[in-house]
Curated annotation (Swiss-Prot):
High-level lineage: Bacteria, Pseudomonadati, Aquificota, Aquificia, Aquificales
Species of origin: Sulfurihydrogenibium sp. (strain YO3AOP1)
Subcellular location: Cytoplasm
Broad class of the protein's primary localization: cytoplasm
UniProt-listed Pfam families: PRC_RimM, RimM
Name used for this protein in its record: Ribosome maturation factor RimM
GO molecular function, one term: ribosome binding
A GO BP annotation: ribosomal small subunit biogenesis
Domain notes from UniProt: The PRC barrel domain binds ribosomal protein uS19.
Gene Ontology CC: one annotated term: cytoplasm
Summary of the function given for this chain in its UniProt record: An accessory protein needed during the final step in the assembly of 30S ribosomal subunit, possibly for assembly of the head region. Essential for efficient processing of 16S rRNA. May be needed both before and after RbfA during the maturation of 16S rRNA. It has affinity for free ribosomal 30S subunits but not for 70S ribosomes.
Keyword Ribonucleoprotein: no
Gene from which this protein is expressed: rimM
UniProt xrefs under InterPro entries: PRC_barrel-like_sf (IPR011033), PRC_RimM (IPR056792), RimM (IPR011961), RimM_N (IPR002676), RimM_N_sf (IPR036976), Transl_B-barrel_sf (IPR009000)
Domain of life: Bacteria
Similarity section: Belongs to the RimM family.
Length: 166
């Protein structure tokens, strides 16, 4: 895969009889360009031109995919776009894809990896798969997350007392 392409969403199954597909975007406030990429069966990037998008309904339609059968050929694939199309972030702001898989350190000792981000509540939580095989949740706030280094793919944390005994 080209290094400058980033997975920003996913195409799910077909919807209706006109070739529409259900989809989701992982990046907030991002508008899809006219051309996106998916990986084909050989894991090669394939460009697709968007015909219509309905973000409220979560539906997308691509040019030359006019039937459910044709649309099914590209269902259940990640959506890739060039990284330079992503909105620029401020200091101490990160895209979720930058944090997933990041090494987590406490007192300079590797304690796990970020497995995912849960932002369904009033604040975001890091879901960390620790080296002791336990999965722990940590509020993604400055009090506990001391440093995030995207280039080195690591973060330093200072979890609350008792966090390791959970």
């Amino acid at each position: 895969m080209k290094k400058d392409l980033i997975a920003i969403g996913k195409i799910h199954g077909t919807h209706g009889v006109k070739g529409n597909l259900k989809f989701e975007i992982f990046v907030k406030n991002f508008y899809l360009p006219e051309e996106i990429y998916i990986k084909d069966e050989e894991n090669e990037l394939q460009p697709l031109n968007i015909e219509t998008v309905d973000r409220k309904k979560g539906l997308i339609k691509f040019k030359n995919y006019d039937t459910p059968e044709k649309a099914k050929e590209i269902s259940h694939r990640l959506i890739y776009v060039p990284e330079d199309l992503l909105p620029k972030l401020g200091e101490d702001e990160f895209y979720e894809f930058q944090l997933i898989g990041m090494d987590v350190y406490y007192n300079d000792k590797l304690i796990g990896k970020v497995e995912k981000i849960d932002d369904r509540l009033s604040q975001a939580y890091l879901i960390i798969k620790c080296t002791d095989e336990k999965t722990r949740h940590l509020p993604f706030i400055n009090e506990f997350v001391k440093d995030v280094n995207v280039k080195e793919n690591k973060m330093q944390i200072t979890p609350p007392e008792g966090w390791f005994s959970l």
